[in-house]
Design a protein with these regions (language model features):
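Structural motif
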Residues: 17-20, 138, 184, 216
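Active-site-adjacent loop and "lid" segments of alpha/beta metabolic enzymes
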Residues: 4-7, 31-45, 64-92, 99-103, ...
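Catalytic domains of carbohydrate-active enzymes, especially glycoside hydrolases
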Residues: 44-60, 252-253
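Phosphate/pyrophosphate-binding loops at sites that engage ATP/ADP/AMP, CoA/4′-phosphopantetheine
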Residues: 50-51, 169-184
Length: 311
């Protein structure tokens, strides 16, 4: 068991996987921004993610895409802060804000965010000072370049895992010097950030080494480029690869998984946990009648055609 402190919350991690559902308040998100263009649509998405099994809602207002211009700060605040207030207030959710900007982080925390997901690798120490002041948890992610810069250099790293460990250990020290409690910190190895697919795969294959840092591990692996490189599929068709990466992360002892497809991830975890043993399901577990593939046809309805054996 490992403790994470996030403002007034004390979270116990380790007994099960935690799911961080993604809500993009940016219309140019690489994955699904254009599908949820209004705050009402984004709030409904958050509601659905929570109902599907999300433990945390991660909200961001600027796409990580490098082919888009930066979003002005006031516009990003306008996108994100009202949504955070409603997801935190109306839905009672644990909210993470995806930002590296201190002014946005401060406004987000005031609106109800409990976690700052900083994808810059703590490039601005003011983020750490803010989290120390407010008690918000802080995600420390590995990246050797500034946000929104793309770097694909197959010769950038020697022992990539050792270099990521050293970088994150130094970032932990910076955060602690700013006044953060050790239990406020989360570690993210930064898949795809300034890494080729091969480098990301090598790093994640050695994920267990990051436990040396003593903090919860966040795996942000949903629909990532390394999955696309392995499967040849575009972002919205990378669910199977995402679940495979999730399974590997579980085996390596990761704690939190940032995913778009929360329902599928929750289903995967339910089946995996049941088959892994432990307490096991109740002896009274039965399939609901409406879920049977051979259920009787309703009056006036033709039986469904069966094109494939299910047994």
């Amino acid at each position: 068991m490992i403790i994470l402190r996030a403002r007034d919350r004390v979270l116990e991690l380790g007994s099960r996987a935690w799911l961080m559902g993604i809500v993009n308040a940016s219309p140019d998100s690489f994955s699904d921004g254009s599908r949820y263009p209004t705050i009402e649509a984004q709030l409904q998405l958050a509601r659905e993610l929570l109902a599907s099994g999300a433990d945390i809602i991660d909200i961001g207002g600027e796409s990580a895409r490098t082919d888009r211009p930066p979003v002005p700060l006031d516009e990003e605040i306008e996108r994100v802060v009202p949504l955070i207030a409603r997801v935190s207030g109306e839905l009672g959710a644990i909210v993470s804000v995806d930002t590296y900007k201190p002014a946005l982080a401060r406004a987000a925390i005031a609106a109800g965010a409990s976690i700052v997901n900083d994808v810059s690798g703590l490039r601005d120490p003011a983020i750490a000072e803010l989290c120390a002041e407010t008690g918000a948890a802080l995600v420390l992610m590995h990246t050797p370049v500034a946000p929104r810069q793309r770097l694909q250099n197959p010769d950038l790293y020697g022992d990539i895992t050792a270099e990521v460990l050293a970088f994150l250990a130094e970032r932990v020290a910076v955060a602690r010097a700013a006044g953060l409690d050790f239990e406020q910190l989360i570690i993210d190895p930064g898949p795809d950030f300034a890494k080729t697919p091969a480098q990301t795969i090598r790093l994640l294959s050695e994920l267990g080494r990051l436990h040396e840092l003593g903090r919860p591990l966040l795996m942000a692996i949903s629909r990532k480029d390394f999955i696309g490189a392995l499967t040849g599929r575009p972002p919205r068709e990378r669910l199977a690869g995402t679940l495979a990466a999730l399974a590997h992360g579980l085996d390596a002892g990761a704690h939190i998984f940032r995913v778009h497809d929360v329902g599928a991830a929750a289903d995967f975890l339910a089946v995996r946990d049941a088959l892994a043993g432990g307490a096991g399901p109740s002896k009274d577990l039965l399939l609901a009648e409406e879920l049977r593939h051979d259920r009787p046809a309703a009056a006036g309805r033709e039986p469904e055609a069966r094109t494939e054996a299910t047994g």
